[in-house]
Amino acid sequence: MVIFRRAIVLVLLLSALVVGRASAGFAPPALKGTPQFVISGHGWGHAVGMGQWGAYGYAQHGFTYDKILAHYYPGTVLSTTTVKSIRVLLANTKSVTISSTGPWKLKDGSAATTTMPAGKVTLNPELKFKLPDGTEAETFTGPLTFTAAAPLVFKKPYRGTFTVTSDGKKITLVNTVPLEQYLYAVVPSEMPKTWLPEALKTQAVAARSYALAVRKASGPFDVYDDTRSQVYGGVNAESPTTTAAVDATVGGVLTYGGKIALTYFFSTSGGRTAAINDVWKSAPVPYLVSVADPYDSLSPYHDWGPLAFTPAKLKTVLKVPGRLLDVQTTVNGSQRVDSVRAIGEKGEHVLTGAEVRTALGLRSTWFSVGVLALDPLPATTLQYGTSFRLTGLGRALPDLRLEQRSPGTAEWVVKRDVEIDDDGSFSVAVKAAAPEEFRVTSGTIATPSTKLVVAPRVALKVSGDLTTLKGSVRPVLPGTPVQIQHQNATTGRWGTVSKVDATRMGRFAWTPQLLDGTYRARVIARGGWAVGLSKKVFVG
C-alpha cells in the first residue's frame, strides 16, 4: 500500500493506444506560435479507497474511526478477524546475515534444535554457515526457523521468528509475526504517528484489512514488506501513539458480503476519491467507489502545479511525430485522465493517463494540461495607429493576461486580460502605438514574446502656392529629424534635399523654392521605431 508522502507504484499492463503516424485525413491545428505546456492537478496516489489526509481531516472534525471507515468504504461492516499471525517476506537473495542480541535457537527441517549464543550468522543457498561462536556448523536441512526472546535482526530488528528456505540458488527470509505486532510497525510507516487517535485507528483497521485481503495463505509468504503490500518498518518504526491505535482496534477488519474487504488507501485525493474501475480498468467493486473527500484540503498535495514543460520535453515523453502543437485529455467518471492525445505536425499519439503520470512523475492522474501559445506577428512594419490582432491558444489555464514592454526595458506591464473562446483560442485587438514586445501569461507561465515593428505615421503635402512642403509626424516625437527627399526622374533614386526637425506639436515644414518632381518625407526616430515614410507628393 502507499507509503505516506509517496504514491503507490502499481505496474499496470494496459493495452497500448498507438497512433504513431499521420493518417490520410490528419490535419494539424493551425498553431504558429511555440506552445508552452502546463500541467496542474490534484491529489497524490491512486485515489482508490481511503485518503489518509481526508481521514485526518474527518478526525479533526470529530468523526470516530468507524464513521470515517464507513465513508470511504461504503457498505462494509466492521468485524473481527480470527487470524493471529502473518508472514512477511524480508528478502529473496543469494545471502542474508541475521543476528540476535541474546541467546537464540535454530530448528531445522528435521525438527532438530540448536541453541546459539548472541551474535550473527550469514546464510547462503547451501544452508551451511558458521555459528556465532565460530564453530563450523553442518549443512542444515531447510526450512530453518530462528527464535529468540529479543527481536531478531535483519538489517533492523523485528518481532517474531525468522524462517529461511533455499531453492539452491537463492534463499528466502520470511518473518512470521503476530498480526497485531505486525501492525505496530505498519501503521507508523504509513501514517504520521503525530496524527489524531481516530485517524490512526482508521489506518490500523484499513491496514489490518488490507493485509488479510491480499495475503497469499497458500504461498511461502503472505505479504511483502514494502509498497507492493504495505511498508513494514520493524521494531524501529514503532511508536506509542500508533501502538495504542492498533490495540484500541485489535482484530478489527472491514468485511463485505462476509469477506475481508480490499481496503486500498493512499495519501491525498484532491477532493474526491476514485472508483477502482476508473483507475485500474477492473470490474466495479461496490465499496470502492468515488466519494467526496471534503477535508482533504488539509493536505499540501490537495492541489499541485502548475508544472511547466517545454515542447521538446513533452515531445520526447509523448512520442509525437513532428513538432508538438497540442495536448488534449479525456477524463472518466472519477475526473481522472483516461487518455492523453498528443498532436504534432506529422501525426498524433495517444497514451493512457497512467502512462503519462509515470513518464512525467506526476502525483496523480487527476490533472489537466494547459496549453499557452501566442502566434508571432509577421515581420512587416505597421504604421502608428494601425489596428491588428494577437492570436493564440490558452486552454485550461487561469487568469490569462496580455503584457507588453518597450525596447530597452526589462519590466513587463499588464496591458489587459485575455478572454478565451470555447475552443481555447483567443484573438485580441491591439493598436500599433509604439515599438513593443508582447507576451501572454498565466501566473508565472509566459509565452515567448513577439515583436511589433512600428513606423511613425508621416503626412506630407504641398502648400497652395507650391512654395512649401509641410507635414506632421504621429505620434508626436519632438526634435525628431525629418528628411525631405526628391526622386530623380531618370534613375528613380531618392536623394535628401533637406533636413528639418519636428516641432513639439509633431509638425515640420520646408520652404525653399521647390523643383518640379516627386517628394516624400522620411523619418528616422529613436527608441526602436522603424523608418517612417510619407506618401509621395508631386509638385509641377
Per-region residue spans from a language model:
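Conserved, single-site charged/polar hotspot
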Residues: 2-465, 475, 483, 504, ...
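Signal that preferentially marks extracellular ectodomain short beta-strand elements
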Residues: 428-429, 509-512
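Glycan-association/targeting regions that enable binding to alpha-glucans and other polysaccharides
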Residues: 468
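Residue-level detector of high-confidence beta-strand sites
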Residues: 415-417, 496-499, 511
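Short aromatic-acidic-glycine turn motif
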Residues: 408-410, 490-494
